[in-house]
Amino acid sequence: MMASYPEPEDASGALLAPETGRAAKEPEAPAPPSPGKGGGGGAGAAPEKPDPAQKPPYSYVALIAMAIRESAEKRLTLSGIYQYIIAKFPFYEKNKKGWQNSIRHNLSLNECFIKVPREGGGERKGNYWTLDPACEDMFEKGNYRRRRRMKRPFRPPPAHFQPGKGLFGAGGAAGGCGVAGAGADGYGYLAPPKYLQSGFLNNSWPLPQPPSPMPYASCQMAAAAAAAAAAAAAAGPGSPGAAAVVKGLAGPAASYGPYSRVQSMALPPGVVNSYNGLGGPPAAPPPPPHPHSHPHAHHLHAAAAPPPAPPHHGAAAPPPGQLSPASPATAAPPAPAPTNAPGLQFACARQPELAMMHCSYWDHDSKTGALHSRLDL
């Protein structure tokens, strides 16, 4: 038997077949980098467009500084800053009220921004804003994401807190604190005992002054009225001294000025009248009510009655001021006017409330108890 062997041409064809397959697969190798051609290689050269839905990673100070630096005159108005931020970052097209309020706050409170008034007076509204030359390099190498810590220049404190002036002003030599002037011991609010010194009562402060001492004549009148009140209390209400007590009430009270309530604090406790707040003797304790039908000295008459005419047989009318025969015989003749009637009238005229109390006490016998309690007030 003869063995059959394949022809060498077939073997060479079989050997060349895998090589052709490899050659066909080799052009596919550079295919993977081709999809990334648009995203990776040209990313650094083409400028990035910010995403409108994403907030820019810059502070409001950086946005303001960016807008001012990129302007032609290195200064912008508030509306110009708004327009630059909206054109640069579309994110700020919405919610304008919130971030624009923050821009205004940063312009006013940050020391890096200086307000420059417009030329030509107030013809156009709005001022220019520019950067302080001392804050030109507050961002490192133009990187607005990193801000350097700036050392703020020393600014003197306000006028009312300058060294050498107290919190309340004039101090050292006077020993107190005023509103104007300078002290020698620095800030006044650091020295607690200072405002307790005597000089604190200054004319510029609307504080009440201590009451002035009473006049000597008022003290004498008050003492005399107190003695008269004690005597009237011992003698009783029907004595002539009762009218003198009412007259004495008006004496010290009339001598007081508009600050009589303050001055009465300096009187002894027994001299202060607790009813009307004015100085004067206290009202005597009321005696027990008693029935009486005789007239008193305070019942004043216009004129004294003439003496009665002698009786005669003719039917003559009685003279004026005399009782008629039909009157009861038990009626007592009117008493003459007391010697102190003008003083009583003067006292009642000066203090109507005292006159009301006095007359109501004597005229109405049934209300004596209630009026006595009124006098004790």
From Swiss-Prot:
Gene3D superfamilies linked: Winged helix-like DNA-binding domain superfamily/Winged helix DNA-binding domain
Biased composition regions of type Pro residues, renumbered to the chain: 305-322
Region (Disordered): 1-53, 277-338
Cross-referenced Pfam families: Forkhead
GO biological process per UniProt: apoptotic DNA fragmentation; embryonic eye morphogenesis; estrogen metabolic process; extraocular skeletal muscle development; female somatic sex determination; granulosa cell differentiation; ovarian follicle development; positive regulation of apoptotic process
One GO cellular component term: nucleus
DNA-binding stretch(es), residue numbering of this chain: 55-149
Glycyl lysine isopeptide (Lys-Gly) (interchain with G-Cter in SUMO) cross-link, chain position(s): K25
Keyword Nucleus: yes
Localisation per UniProt entry: Nucleus
Major localisation: nucleus
Keywords: Differentiation, DNA-binding, Isopeptide bond, Nucleus, Phosphoprotein, Transcription, Transcription regulation, Ubl conjugation
Tissue specificity of this protein: Detected in the majority of somatic cells in the developing ovary.
Residue numbers carrying Phosphoserine: S34
GO molecular function: cysteine-type endopeptidase regulator activity involved in apoptotic process; DNA binding; DNA-binding transcription factor activity; DNA-binding transcription factor activity, RNA polymerase II-specific; RNA polymerase II cis-regulatory region sequence-specific DNA binding
Post-translational modification note: Sumoylated with SUMO1; sumoylation is required for transcriptional repression activity.
Origin: domain of life: Eukaryota
Function: Transcriptional regulator. Critical factor essential for ovary differentiation and maintenance, and repression of the genetic program for somatic testis determination. Prevents trans-differentiation of ovary to testis through transcriptional repression of the Sertoli cell-promoting gene SOX9. Has apoptotic activity in ovarian cells. Suppresses ESR1-mediated transcription of PTGS2/COX2 stimulated by tamoxifen. Activates SIRT1 transcription under cellular stress conditions. Activates transcription of OSR2. Is a transcriptional repressor of STAR.
Subunit (UniProt): Interacts with ESR1. Interacts with UBE2I/UBC9. Interacts with SMAD3. Interacts with DDX20.
Name of the protein: Forkhead box protein L2
Natural source organism: Capra hircus (Goat)
Upper taxonomic lineage: Eukaryota, Metazoa, Chordata, Craniata, Vertebrata
Gene behind the chain: FOXL2
